[in-house]
UniProtKB/Swiss-Prot annotation:
Biological classification of the source: Eukaryota, Viridiplantae, Streptophyta, Embryophyta, Tracheophyta
Similarity-based family: Belongs to the DEAD box helicase family. DDX3/DED1 subfamily.
Pfam families on file: DEAD, Helicase_C
Molecular-function GO terms, alphabetical: ATP binding; ATP hydrolysis activity; mRNA binding; RNA helicase activity
Keywords: ATP-binding, Helicase, Hydrolase, Nucleotide-binding, RNA-binding
Origin species: Oryza sativa subsp. japonica (Rice)
UniProt xrefs under InterPro entries: DEAD/DEAH_box_helicase_dom, Ded1/Dbp1_DEADc, Helicase_ATP-bd, Helicase_C-like, P-loop_NTPase, RNA_helicase_DEAD_Q_motif
Family matches, as PROSITE patterns: HELICASE_ATP_BIND_1 (PS51192), HELICASE_CTER (PS51194), Q_MOTIF (PS51195)
Presence of keyword ATP-binding: yes
Motif Q motif, residue range(s) on this chain: 155-183
Identification of the protein by name: DEAD-box ATP-dependent RNA helicase 52C
Length: 623
């Protein structure tokens, strides 16, 4: 049995807290376009010549109320003072009349800040950790794009015309410069192209699809949303689908930061929570709907949401959306409801893994798309140190205790080290949480049987450091951004190498370092080869005993559905169209693509077939 290291975590854990953002010196600038009307100002009952009585003018303006709009059309914007071009209440005013968008309520409900005046930054921007991103770790990342006429990448946000209001929010979020996936994905999306992007967890994918969507809605023509008699049916312009409620809430939180004082209204809908409040939020108007598939199908069947006005469709963690039972729901939403077809809408798919079979399914939703693969940050800088230790089932708890004691002994006094422990079952999560607490290690747990309030409380308690150990099933493995996780422990290894990749991606985020420890025994034999290959591709030390397991013929075929066969990566870092087009002129089709060090990332044009290893050149495995 391998002896656990009592100090290894300290060599790689990033203990620096995220610096608190300083308040902005200037108030928000006004957007520079006037075509957009926020949802709560549309189709108002005010009229200068109709039968409806006009509401009283806003206290901040003496202008006349807007004329009544024809059915199905948008009302002209009222000329309220201070509203800003493209303003109009920030989506928070319901149907009660115009509001100054510089008085938009804090999205996080800070009642003490009634108005975000000049120099006042809302609480929503507090504790943002982007200034802690280690951009030096991104400098040598290989990037590949394939498809026709790929737009060139950008180096700074100043090169991208996103609009003044959105640029102000980028500064409020302390975004210094784009991450690699943002450098490539944002110009592609702003050019109106469909996109399939494969990029590391924690690399800024949410902003990569939110920025173009918000900018496009602000700049786009007024939407002619349908009227459905007396029923209030929400007709969003953009739909963002995600597989879990936690991830949906996280995307919603980030999107509200980015859309602050732009007039773009963001609403979230997910299962496991009362639907009535979500219906009320939708009735107030929605531009961007963030939803899980199950709850969205429910809303569509109730005719409370229509997708016929959708201009933008984004799938986050798209590989999971098209796998593990989600595909029928996603296909029903995208293909069998009233959503515009590919070509009439813009579609963006993002994930950390894109196996070939998932790419084939996803291509049904796309038209003339660009494939983007961004190499793993830790492939050359070893930001995530992976350790695999042989531990029998009966010894796992005592072995975990040894690791936690070593971690506690080496920790900085007063600064808890966040540790995420993954187990396979819900019962196992509850049992291990109780055992840890009984042995002096404050812990909490999150899994599918917890109600929404319990899950939110557990995440808050963990993020704050009040309970620095979180025991979780895979419900927390996908997409969640939990800053400052120093150590991920795979107490129970998953059966699929993709799930392992997503689990360890909870640490080493934003270019920071982290440690991932896995407990391996005979029950995990089918994972041996895939695990050894992943560690080799990531420049990790592979234990000799694991190499022997991997070499055994009886264990060679495991590791889940995405085991490598031939060239390319099991994680889908290579456009499957390249392989299917080989031998029949595929090179001409992809003449617009680029690879390797394009745009200053990655110093070579050969790095293993798209930055994921398995081809010619230096291997580079990335999730």
């Amino acid at each position: 049995m391998a002896t656990p290291s009592r100090t290894s975590w300290a060599d790689v854990a990033d203990a620096d807290p995220a610096p608190a953002p300083a308040p902005a010196a200037n108030g928000p600038a006004r957007p520079d376009r006037s075509s957009y009307v926020p949802p709560h100002l549309r189709n108002r009952g005010a009229s200068s010549g109709g039968g409806a009585a006009a509401p009283p003018p806003s206290s901040s303006s003496s202008s006349a109320p807007p004329p009544r709009a024809a059915p199905g059309l948008l009302a002209p914007r009222p000329a309220a003072a201070g509203m800003g071009r493209m303003g109009g209440g920030g989506g928070g005013g319901g149907f009660g009349g115009p509001r100054r968008w510089d008085r938009e309520p804090n999205p996080f409900g800070n009642d003490g800040d009634a108005a975000a005046g000049a120099g006042d930054e809302p609480e929503v921007f507090d504790a943002h950790q982007n200034t802690g991103i280690n951009f030096d770790a991104y400098e040598d990342i290989p990037v590949e794009t394939s498809g026709r006429e790929v737009p060139p990448p950008v180096g700074t946000f100043a090169e991208i015309d996103l609009g003044q209001a959105l640029n102000d929010n980028i500064r409020r979020c302390k975004y210094v410069r784009p991450t690699p996936v943002q450098r490539y994905a944002i110009p592609i999306s702003l050019a109106g192209r469909d996109l399939m992007a494969c990029a590391q967890t924690g690399s800024g994918k949410t902003a990569a699809f939110c920025f173009p969507i918000i900018s496009g809605i602000m700049r786009g023509p007024p939407a002619q949303r349908p009227q459905r008699g007396g029923m209030r049916t929400a007709c969003p312009l953009a739909l963002i689908l995600s597989p879990t409620r936690e991830l949906s809430m996280q995307i919603h939180e980030e999107a509200r930061k980015f859309s602050y004082q732009t007039g773009v209204r963001v609403v979230v809908a997910y299962g496991g929570a009362p639907i009535n409040q979500q219906l009320r939020d939708l009735e107030r108007g929605v531009d961007i709907l963030v939803a899980t598939p199950g709850r969205l199908v429910d809303l569509l069947e109730r005719a409370r949401v229509s997708l016929q006005s959708i201009r933008y469709l984004a799938l986050d963690e798209a590989d999971r959306m098209l796998d593990m039972g989600f595909e029928p729901q996603v296909r029903r939403i995208v293909e069998q409801m009233d959503m515009p077809p590919p070509g009439a809408r813009q579609t963006m798919l993002f994930s950390a893994t894109f196996p070939k079979e998932i790419q084939r399914m996803a291509s049904d939703f796309l038209e003339n798309y660009i494939f983007l693969a961004v190499g793993r940050v830790g492939s050359s800088t070893d930001l995530i140190v992976q350790r695999v230790e042989f531990v029998q089932e009966a010894d796992k708890r005592s072995h975990l205790m040894d690791l936690l004691h070593a971690q506690r002994d080496s920790a900085t006094p007063g600064k808890p080290t966040l540790t995420l422990v993954f187990v396979e079952t819900k019962r196992g999560a509850d049992s291990l949480e109780h055992w840890l607490c009984m042995n002096g290690f404050p812990a909490t747990s999150i899994h599918g049987d917890r109600n929404q309030q319990e899950r939110e409380y557990a995440l808050r308690s963990f993020k704050s450091g009040h309970t620095p150990i979180l025991v979780a099933t895979d419900v927390a493995a996908r997409g969640l951004d939990i800053p400052h996780v120093a150590h991920v422990v795979n107490f129970d290894l998953p059966n699929d190498i993709d799930d392992y990749v997503h689990r360890i991606g909870r640490t080493g985020r934003a270019g920071k370092s982290g440690l991932a420890t896995a407990f391996f025994n005979e029950n995990n034999s089918s994972m041996a080869r895939s695990l050894a290959e992943l560690m080799q591709e990531s420049n990790q030390e592979v234990p000799a005993w694991l190499s022997r397991y991997a070499a055994r013929p009886s264990y060679g075929g495991g590791g889940g559905r995405n085991r490598r066969s031939g060239g390319g990566s099991r994680f889908g870092g290579r456009d499957f169209r390249r392989d299917s087009s080989s031998g029949r002129g595929g090179g001409d089709y992809y003449g617009g693509g680029s690879s390797g060090g394009a745009g200053g990332y990655g110093g070579s044009s050969a790095y293993g077939g798209g930055g994921y290893g398995g081809g010619a050149g230096a291997p580079s495995a990335w999730d």
